[in-house]
Amino acid sequence: ADYRPSKTHGQFLAGCPDIVLNTRYIWVSNLSYERYRSWLKFLAEYERSVKSKSKGVFILEVNEAVGALRKERGIHNIVWKDMVGRYDITMFALLLLSEWKKPDIYKQYVAELASALSADNARLCGALSAARLELAENPQQCLEKQCEKLDFPPPPAETSAKAVWEVQLKVLFPITEQFRQQFTGRYGSQIERLLPLQAVYGEVFDEPGTVELGTLKYLCDLGKLAVAGEDLRGLVLFHKTRNTLAHLQTVDYTDVEELLR
């Protein structure tokens, strides 16, 4: 007859008060559903039988959808998608980038890219964040490279391009509007003398602060506004950025770098 021990593995380990297991965290990753069930049985036996005040803590990472998880004594179920969202992933990326010697707005841009392109996958987000400048310069190429390293299937190029556009809209559009407000404030007296102004699409501007970038650039091209060279270069860049995003296209990195200085 086969030898059958009187105690299961869980019961035996629970009855050993001085083993190192009682002071450790044990993280078991990439479990299939079947392996998860086996571990769950072991942990249930261990939890019921342990006598020590100190006991091991087991973390089971299941890589498959397991449906409704059983509730066992001493076992807490954490469903990743219910606990960790885009905000958490973005904060994670910002933390990883916190010591990078770049302006805060630049670090925010790279963190938003890492978060959006990772589709809330923390491992991929971490890898993308670690790439730093490579991610900023060529998001698609960097994404494909990191997915290959981690053995993750890369998303379709259209999906990642849309994610990059959304990040640029989120980060670049507010600073574009900020520039417009500063420009109209700085040259308000000149603009006021030209009012009312009519834009290409028929919109009429009665106040300096409402004039949009296209009209401001048009006035400069006609020589009707005398502005500093740096302000004119900024106007051209921000107008180009606004138009690019408005046409659902992504801004080139050379322009992004200039915008985020």
Task: Describe each region flagged by the PLM.
Residues H9-R24, S32-S52, V62-K240, T244-R261:
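Amphipathic alpha-helical interface elements
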Residues A1-S6, N22:
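Conserved P-loop NTPase mechanochemical-coupling segment
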